[in-house]
Amino acid sequence: REKQHLYYRSGGTVKDTANFLKSQIGNYYFKTNKFQAETKVDVTNKDGSTLVSDHLDYYTSSGIADLFGPSTITNVENKIYTEKGSHNSKTNISHFIKNSIIYYSDRIVKGDSLYYNKNTDFASATGNIEIIDTVNASIIKGGYAELFKLKDSMFITDEAVAISEVVENDSIYIHGDTLLITGKLEER
């Protein structure tokens, strides 16, 4: 009681205005409004998105979850995998910094560091980026990229290269300082 520390070791559930969190092990620190969850962590947001991890620190006042170890965020539009980063369940803005991948229905985005805003469907990737476009059978690589899903466009800088399969076993490579790739005008 003096420590202002609540804990459980054999499964528990915590609910706030935005999320419903379940885990095997949990610690809540009243002074910092920090909930530390470990082992089979499952967070469901009021919009239906889920976050699954083995360890996260969740701050109830801000809605920020710091993720440690393999973690997956799934919603209707996409699925995100990371091994370290943070996700704000109130603003739907995330920043991932280790082995991070965004899986869209038509492309996969990888990078050393990923920023994602679910509200605007905007993502940026920094360092060793790779974008696999399944619709156009192409791979785009570079050092920095920004993707605007709603506008069906992206630009890539820092040793940007686009590799497109023309026919089976034959590809075309396009390289430039900056590459801008857009979908068909009538479909944007």
Regions found by a protein language model. Name each.
Residues 1-188:
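Structural signature for solvent-exposed beta-strand/loop edge elements and short helix-capping sites
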